[in-house]
A protein has these predicted regions:
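Active-site-proximal loop/helix of nucleotide/amide-processing enzymes and allied scaffolds
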Residues: 15-20, 42, 52-133
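Long amphipathic N-terminal alpha/beta scaffold segment
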Residues: 1-50
Length: 133
């Protein structure tokens, strides 16, 4: 489900930009939500797509759902974003595995995954900054 954001069209050039756009909506949720930020060639946010809404601390993510809107929008790239309801943005082993799978799918589709940002309470983890992509 695509969501219209007031931030659409805003440049998203750093993990801090991602956090600024998504934290107000995600950091205090009681369940995990997984979003895809669809970017244009100038790294502007074209669309925010809510891929899944989980229960408590898990969220199932399938590449087909992640890339559906990106393909339709002719995305230049995407950024993966989800929250950890615990407030701790440390990536889990499942987070790492899903990210590897989605990066591989993005390569096949020629839609690069620029980052995966996990939102916690008042902080975040960027896979790109941490060297995990």
């Amino acid at each position: 489900m695509a969501v219209e954001l007031r931030d659409e069209g805003a440049p998203v050039r750093s993990p801090a930009d991602v956090h600024a756009v998504f934290a107000p909506r995600l950091e205090d949720l009681p369940v995990e939500e997984f979003h895809v930020a669809v970017l244009d060639a100038q790294h502007r946010l074209e669309r925010d797509v809510t891929v899944t809404r989980g229960i408590l601390n898990s969220s199932l993510v399938h590449p087909r759902e992640v890339f559906r809107e990106a393909i339709a929008e002719r995305a230049a790239a995407i950024i993966l974003v989800h929250n950890h309801p615990s407030g701790d943005p440390t990536p889990s082993s499942d987070d790492r595995l899903v990210t590897e799978q989605l990066v591989a799918a993005g390569r096949l589709l020629d839609i690069p995954v620029h980052d995966h940002v996990i939102i916690g309470r008042g902080r975040y983890t960027s896979f790109a900054q941490a060297g995990l992509l």
